[in-house]
Amino acid sequence: MQHASVKKLFKEQVIHYSKEGQYEKLPLLHVILTWLRHKKYKRKVNICEFGGGNGQLLKQIQKCYPNCTLTNIEIIDEYRRFLVSQKIKFVLGSILEPGFADGTFDILIIRDVLHHLVGKNYTETLHNQRRALIELQRLVRPGGAIFIEELTNESEVATRCIYYLSWLNTKIGIHIPSLFVSRNVIVAFFTSRRLLNICSQIFGKKNIEKQESAVKLQWYFALLHLLGGAKKVILTIKK
């Protein structure tokens, strides 16, 4: 079960995440399109993104690979109004309870979802994160792939402190939108090592390809990350 603050946060940010032009140069898009070119599917490909906002990434995939069925599963129904293509099926739902049969999708995508799967406490949060990965494993067809993009913090101490400080702020209520400080934000970041370890346990290390790059943060983001150092990690997981 997710903390109530998660929906409140993303309801606040619907307009921000619906702005056009955010995904054309996304490294993850290149990774997915490269996979599709090499795979050479001869049938329609069933692609699903969890937390896809108004569907901009899915639309970019469709432009380059029109022979696909697209599903966007979102916890925020307001995104339905901003959907960028009528060819994208919008489903109100959660990665924790997706409601689809085993092996439904050829490709599954999640971007910066895992650190928002916050429960009522830290233990439940870790359970939610693992459960989401297990659901991805269940939903992907044999021969398919899972693409995970996640912002990580490279200090295990910082990840834990950020969680508890952000949880505390939901009680205190400090809200500075210009500095991306919200009373509705609780985050539980992975380190890149811990993310790879848990994915290896679930999917098998030999099935995972990892790309990572350091993220240069503006000073206020660096402070919010407690100077732990941030990375963008992209995992391609084959089944």
What are these regions (language model features)?
Residues G119-Q129:
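Short, flexible/disordered intra-domain loops and linkers
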Residues I109:
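A conserved beta-strand element that flanks and buttresses the S-adenosyl-L-methionine
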Residues C48-F50, N54-E97:
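Class I SAM-dependent methyltransferase SAM/SAH-binding core
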Residues Q2-K39:
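Class I SAM-dependent methyltransferase Rossmann-like catalytic core
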Residues I202-G204, W219-K239:
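Core SAM-dependent methyltransferase catalytic element
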Residues F147-Q218:
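C-terminal alpha-helical "lid/dimerization" subdomain adjacent to the S-adenosyl-L-methionine
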Residues D112-H116:
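Short catalytic micro-motifs in class I SAM-dependent methyltransferases
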Residues H127-P142:
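A short glycine-rich, Lys/Arg-flanked "PGG" loop and its adjoining helix->strand segment in the class I
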